[in-house]
């Protein structure tokens, strides 16, 4: 996907809307998302677009994949497959942030090309003031 292409998914803000969050929580309770469970969700939530329901199901799958790498952040962050493939493990990001602060002190840091923002998150946790910059507008939102 080129940076100028429209995102193939609903905007991250749509995935954070109250109805979408409720549906994400319901999907988290399923051991597996199947075509029949998606059809049931579409039937039970006619006010939500099929594209949004599919995107929420994708988020549930990505959360499962992301949990070993970023822990509980996977439950609340909006994820994207390509960025998830490159994401720094949270424990590694925290270690690096701690080392940076130990050696240089907590100061202002720019994370250019921050992706999902795990390194930025860890730097902020360590006491840094972080400017997180992402070129991809979908990820940046």
Question: Which stretches of residues belong to each language-model region?
Answer:
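SAM-dependent transferase fold signal centered on methyltransferase-like domains
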Residues: 1-141
């Amino acid at each position: 996907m080129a940076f100028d292409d429209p995102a193939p998914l609903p905007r991250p803000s749509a995935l954070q809307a109250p109805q979408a969050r409720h549906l994400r929580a319901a999907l988290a309770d399923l051991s597996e998302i199947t075509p029949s469970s998606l059809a049931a969700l579409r039937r039970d939530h006619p006010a939500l677009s099929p594209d949004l329901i599919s995107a929420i199901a994708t988020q549930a799958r990505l959360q499962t994949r992301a949990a070993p790498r970023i822990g509980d952040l996977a439950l609340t962050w909006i994820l994207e497959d390509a960025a998830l493939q490159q994401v720094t493990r949270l424990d590694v990001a925290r270690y690096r942030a701690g080392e940076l602060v130990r050696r240089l002190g907590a100061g202002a840091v720019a994370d250019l090309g921050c992706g999902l923002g795990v390194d930025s998150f860890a730097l902020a946790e360590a006491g840094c003031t972080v400017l997180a910059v992402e070129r991809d507008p979908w990820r940046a939102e």
